[in-house]
């Protein structure tokens, strides 16, 4: 039964719909088809926004050499990973630690190869979980930070560096770099009352390859580096490496980790972990090919299963550096320094709590 007209002369909703349908059926067939497609497509478009967790797994890579170089080294492994987890894997390779850190903060990275402070921040602040840690052929549980200088005089001795740092030009890593900044600052420069950011005549900030080349080519006088990257540098730049010497080396630093977004299903994280820990372990041609890929990735021997607790040494390093900086900084009064130290203690306690989560 039709709805009666409203008393004010307007039509009821049912009458309006019938009028609309009569006009719609009078349209040419082509226009009716177009209108139907648009009408039906609107709700689909509104609900078909793809979640990042349903799209490609976005893998972030530390810029250890250069962006292109890092990507080409990882491509074969990531192609196999894509097959193993039955999902596409895209690569984010950047030119700086800062660029990778910003991408992680914008949730543009789902999985990453990170070390030290960056891995720690990803786990404690950006909802990531550790699934694996790299191992190298030397069998050591870590690597060492280095200070490199030219063999040729005059600026070629640790004694001279300690006595006159303002005469030296520094080439260092970014502040997020464990061996390029954090460990040299904590274990060498600050104990000798030298602030890396202010005591040198000039500085170059870049990758480990960039810093080593800067000293070899006389663009800087001392560079931060590490044992793993310097070995790689010797192979790629033998003539330049021959000009360099090691002035200092640190205590052992734990190897880098693979972290995965916490929102991914546990089953996917386990499959990623299983793939990584099995990569390069097989016998025969396939295993040989995988071991060649691993060797190109900073002479890696493979991966071992790991969890968030593997970042406890990194948390301890960051805590020690923050305390050192607070103790040596200038403050308006003792209360301000004490407040800063209390915030450092509180932040460290929170990190330790997060790192106790060792669930898969």
What is the role of each PLM region?
Residues 65-66, 72, 76, 271-360:
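An extracytoplasmic/periplasmic, membrane-proximal ligand-sensing/linker region
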Residues 46-50:
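Boundary at the C-terminal end of the N-terminal hydrophobic targeting segment
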Residues 32-43:
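Bacterial N-terminal signal peptides
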Residues 54, 58-82, 94, 140-213:
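Bilobed "Venus flytrap"/periplasmic-binding protein-like clamshell domains
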Residues 1-29:
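N-terminal secretory signal peptides that target proteins for export/translocation
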Residues 56-63, 136-146, 238-273, 291-307:
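Periplasmic-binding protein-like
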Residues 98-112, 125, 143, 208-223:
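Short helices/loops that flank or line small-molecule/ion binding pockets
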Residues 116-126, 189-190, 216-217, 221-242:
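A ligand-binding cleft/hinge motif common to bilobed small-molecule-binding domains
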């Amino acid at each position: 039964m039709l709805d009666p007209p409203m008393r004010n002369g307007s039509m009821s909703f049912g009458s309006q719909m019938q009028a609309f349908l009569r006009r719609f059926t009078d349209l040419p067939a082509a226009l009716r088809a177009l209108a139907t497609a648009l009408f039906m497509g609107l709700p689909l478009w509104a609900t078909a926004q793809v979640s990042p967790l349903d799209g490609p797994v976005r893998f972030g890579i530390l810029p250890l050499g250069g962006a292109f170089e890092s990507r080409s080294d990882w491509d074969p492994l990531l192609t196999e990973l894509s097959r193993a987890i039955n999902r596409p894997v895209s690569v984010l390779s950047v030119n700086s630690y800062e660029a990778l850190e910003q991408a992680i903060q914008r949730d543009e990275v789902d999985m990453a190869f990170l070390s030290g402070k960056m891995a720690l921040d990803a786990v404690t602040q950006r909802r990531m979980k550790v699934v694996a840690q790299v191992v190298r052929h030397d069998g050591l549980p870590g690597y060492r930070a280095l200070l490199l200088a030219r063999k040729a005089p005059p600026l070629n001795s640790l004694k001279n560096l300690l006595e006159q740092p303002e005469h030296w030009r520094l080439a260092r890593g970014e502040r997020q770099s464990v061996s390029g900044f954090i460990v040299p600052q904590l274990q060498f420069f600050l104990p000798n009352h030298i602030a890396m950011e202010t005591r040198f005549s000039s500085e170059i900030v870049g990758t480990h390859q960039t810093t080593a080349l800067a000293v070899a080519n006389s663009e800087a006088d001392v560079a931060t580096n590490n044992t793993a990257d310097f070995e790689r540098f010797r192979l790629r730049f033998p003539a330049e490496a021959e000009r360099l010497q090691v002035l200092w080396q640190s205590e052992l630093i734990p190897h880098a980790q693979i972290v995965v977004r916490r929102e991914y299903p546990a089953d996917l994280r386990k499959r990623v972990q299983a793939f990584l820990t099995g990569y390069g372990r097989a016998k025969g041609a396939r295993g040989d090919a995988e071991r060649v890929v691993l060797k190109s990735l900073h002479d890696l021997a493979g991966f071992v299963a790991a969890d968030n607790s593997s970042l406890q040494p990194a948390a301890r390093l960051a805590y020690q550096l923050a305390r050192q900086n607070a103790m040596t900084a200038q403050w308006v009064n003792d209360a301000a320094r004490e407040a800063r130290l209390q915030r450092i203690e509180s932040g460290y306690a929170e990190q330790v709590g997060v790192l106790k989560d060792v669930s898969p």
